[in-house]
């Protein structure tokens, strides 16, 4: 659901996959770790702006997620790593690989539902964030 909700610009469903206190980590161009709250209002606004930009400019993303490695699994906790190839199709014409991604996810099961509580994004190459004005 993670890639499908993001790729179809369904922010509400995408955010429903995360706990209310979910943490996201990634690295900037200088290799410094950046930590954010996934459901922080500014973070959600940036995500919405990015989805709107993709949609209005004819950019389609596809997260090709595979090679899931479950490191730990209990009744209420899971820790896994997963490879992703992030593709983009611009103006319905050219398909390109944006970057391979190596995700680190931690999930919690609450009231019978698994939700992401932690997500680390390791990129092999920078995202094309410069596309946005």
PLM regions: where:
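Short, aromatic-enriched amphipathic alpha-helices that serve as compact interaction elements
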Residues: 1-7
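A solvent-exposed, acidic/Ser-Thr-rich amphipathic alpha-helical stretch
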Residues: 11-83
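Alpha-helical hinge/cap motifs
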Residues: 8-10, 112
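A beta-strand edge to alpha-helix "cap/lid" segment located at domain peripheries
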Residues: 54-133
